[in-house]
From Swiss-Prot:
One of its GO terms (cellular component) is membrane. Glycosylated. The lineage of its organism: Eukaryota, Metazoa, Chordata, Craniata, Vertebrata. This is Ammonium transporter Rh type A. It comes from Homo sapiens. The gene is RHAG. Erythrocytes. GO terms for biological process: ammonium homeostasis; ammonium transmembrane transport; bicarbonate transport; carbon dioxide transmembrane transport; carbon dioxide transport; erythrocyte development; inorganic cation transmembrane transport; intracellular monoatomic ion homeostasis. Residues 24-51, 101-113, 164-167, 230-239, 292-295, 354-362 are extracellular. It is a multi-pass membrane protein. It catalyses: methylamine(out) = methylamine(in); NH4(+)(in) = NH4(+)(out); CO2(out) = CO2(in).
Length: 409
């Protein structure tokens, strides 16, 4: 850790600086016009029109995701700190990879949409991070960030440019992809020594409150996430409204099913922290489609139910039978709701809510899951090499391995 991590971080940042010097320029007014398909003259005002949405997404990435993962009682520093590290590297690398793909290897101009998409690429890695939380080193996370974004960007390009599928809120390309990529990595990195659990793999009263802060930030800003890159006008308005009501319906369903499946009808904080967000994930694919508010509420309700049931029944099954230990339960918050979103998109297209093809929507869902699993397995094999400073079983879920921590915790 003393030399491997600093060397890796410095080399990667030098590489980012060199790549930005070779490929990235400021965006010009003419480029803005072409990117947004606007024929009349405009100015850089479009940058500042989208900047509030970008800031909302930015808060979700750095505050929402970071604090959502602070539920482990002795892993708060790593949850927030490594989240910051991964996101900072991810947005730089995502800018480069996505830009090169779009420009076919030529220089490209950077604008507000590039910055939003860069944050989206970082979000994908943060979702996967949740599956291996507490069991990996900072060096391993840097490597995973570099590799995952390459797979993510190519799949996103395939979905949007080749299949021409609709996935404005990225239920398939970000949420399902990130979840199944993380599960594949977790499967390769499975530790038999942790099959009976670990004393630090639990929450405390204060850590659950911190995690709930992350939930609230994500919940409030999710309409911005799903509408940030939508076509201005009716589609962007629909994306905001549909997400707003899907999230609201999801909360009631999540609370109801949490009480239903828990002993004596008590609410489980794990369900409330996570399943209440599933509606935002699931409505993403068809957020900008004319599915009507009641349609978005149906999607949100289904997502909340599926998420709670996943936490209650599927997570233990994955650990004991499939040897996939999902620390944060990303399969239930992002994976299953992402699949629900993909299926909802197919149904919406079949009902005439979009001009895209049902076959291409299905292909996009299959591609996202397939690429994620293959990429995750390959990445997991690389991360398993014994030179990245991964913690021992005994030291998992403990900040003191990689951080200076106070004596009193």
């Amino acid at each position: 850790m003393r030399f491997t991590f600093p060397l890796m971080a410095i080399v990667l940042e030098i590489a980012m600086i060199v790549l930005f010097g070779l490929f990235v320029e400021y965006e010009t007014d003419q480029t803005v016009l072409e990117q947004l398909n606007i024929t009349k003259p405009t100015d850089m005002g479009i940058f500042f029109e989208l900047y509030p949405l970008f800031q909302d997404v930015h808060v979700m990435i750095f505050v929402g995701f970071g604090f959502l993962m602070t539920f482990l009682k002795k892993y708060g520093f790593s949850s927030v700190g490594i989240n910051l590290l991964v996101a900072a590297l991810g947005l730089q690398w995502g800018t480069i990879v996505q830009g090169i793909l779009q420009s076919q290897g030529q220089k490209f101009n950077i604008g507000i949409k590039n910055m939003i998409n860069a944050d989206f690429s970082a979000a994908t890695v943060l979702i996967s991070f949740g599956a291996v939380l507490g069991k990996t080193s900072p060096t391993q996370m840097l490597i995973m960030t570099i590799l995952e974004i390459v797979f993510f960007a190519h799949n996103e390009y395939l979905v949007s440019e080749i299949f021409k599928a609709s996935d404005i809120g990225a239920s398939m390309t970000i949420h399902a992809f990130g979840a199944y990529f993380g599960l594949a990595v977790a499967g390769i990195l499975y530790r038999s020594g942790l099959r009976k659990g670990h004393e630090n793999e639990e929450s405390a009263y204060y850590s659950d409150l911190f995690a709930m802060i992350g939930t609230l930030f994500l919940w409030m800003f999710w309409p911005s996430f799903n509408s940030a890159i939508a076509e201005p006008g009716d589609k962007q308005c629909r994306a905001i409204v549909n997400t707003y009501f899907s999230l609201a319906a999801c909360v009631l369903t999540a609370f109801a099913f949490s009480s239903l499946v828990e002993h004596r009808g008590k609410l489980n904080m794990v369900h409330i922290q996570n399943a209440t967000l599933a509606g935002g994930v699931a409505v993403g694919t068809c957020a900008d489609m004319a599915i009507h508010p009641f349609g978005s509420m149906i999607i949100g309700s289904i997502a909340g139910m599926v998420s709670v049931l996943g936490y209650k029944f599927l997570t233990p099954l994955f650990t004991t039978k499939l040897r996939i230990h999902d620390t944060c339960g990303v399969h239930n918050l992002h994976g299953l709701p992402g699949v629900v979103g993909g299926l909802a998109g197919i149904v919406a297209v079949a009902m005439g809510a979009s001009n895209t093809s049902m076959a291409m929507q299905a292909a996009a869902l299959g591609s996202s899951i397939g690429t994620a699993v293959v990429g995750g397995l390959m990445t997991g094999l690389i991360l398993k090499l014994p030179l990245w400073g991964q913690p021992s079983d005994q030291n998992c879920y403990d900040d003191s391995v990689y951080w200076k921590v106070p004596k009193t915790r």
